[in-house]
Amino acid sequence: QILCFIFKMLTRKISGHILTIGCEYRHPKGGVAQVMYNYEKYVFPVFNCIVNSGGTNNVAKLLKAISGYLLMAIHLTTDSHLRIVHIHTSSYNSFKRSAYFVRLAKAFGRKVVLHIHGGDFKKYYVTNPKWIASVLNRCDMIVTLSESWKNYFQTITNGPQIRIVENIVAPPQEGCQLWNDGKCHLLFLGKVCKEKGIFDLLDVIRKH
């Protein structure tokens, strides 16, 4: 119990130094939002977070990004305890938006952890490799979701540390129900597209 108490105190102290930047997550509708929701609920005792994207139209999204940028500047100006900026991003517009937050954090002398979720990042990278690489190399650490992504980012960067942090899932709220009808029951929660791997999974099931 004493060790558990000490661990919780240390975790609270460390998490208080982190400022998280990412999409609207209170009512998660996507993978990144769900990860952030789980971080707040299950991982970080103190979850300092600024939302930099959300809304149903381009104007709302732009206003959310601008307000998030200003809020981040205020927080970094007034709170010297915030030492690490943890930015969740993906590809295309998400990465372009995150680039401004990376630059702002470095301008204030903070460490930057860029947590990349985008499955289309390889396709995105070839659209502007020089600029994208410059943003990545400004970061102190890049977080990827798998070994293959880690290997990929090692080939296009030359500065930041690269670490693997797999997405966490919430523990089940109810006991598992067992089915004994001889059938395979598969629940897929996500966008039905090639990048998510659902078609590969169905193909493997068909073959085996």
Report residues per predicted region.
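A short, basic/aromatic alpha-helical/loop segment that forms part
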Residues: 29, 95, 171-174, 193-198
